Amino acid sequence: MVRAAEALVPEARPLRWTVDLARPVPIGRVDVRAEVVRSGRRTSLVAAELIADGRSCFSARILMVVPVADAPPATAGVPETREGVPFQFPFFPWPEGFHTAVEARRIAGEPGCGDLAVWLRLRVALVDGEVATPSQRVAALTDAGSGVGWGLDTQVWTFLNADLDQHILRAPRGEWLGLHARTRRAADGVGLARTEVFDADGVIGDAQQGLVLARVVTA
């Protein structure tokens, strides 16, 4: 989605993307349809849809902004210097998937407590033969926020994110992206994951995901 938006408005960079997820994306061929639905001097809005097997898996609206040189000084970030220890997502039932496409290092918190910080790095190309842009890497990795900050027994409960709403202050520097995710739950099967996104130089943005919580169905 972000890749398509960058191609349509190459002079701009993503500031915000809002994604609504309709169904899981299968492993296989997918197609992305995108168009500029609003264009202005500094901002443009791109609508995009991901199609697999003839069905829409999710849709997105990406707000693009044109950067300028005549701008006030940037606010100082707080450097993130912790290295972390190797970490694996323990709840994926498949031999291959997101958990094998990334390298992860835990830097704060305990897994499963609902408050965890990790470093993530892509192991694979998002598109064969292409080097992902910084914004594309952010889009690919921050969807993991709900999985980083999970706080339930995954043998008993599932937590599916129904959306992703993200703002990015600036592009990350370096290949490692940090996520500090916290999850809160209501008593009616609804949750909210809030994620601070950072690199070694400090905070670069934040993300929110609405969660649909349900008991694991056993045969």
Regions found by a protein language model. Give the residues of each.
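Terminal targeting signals and extreme-terminal segments of soluble enzymes
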Residues: 1-219
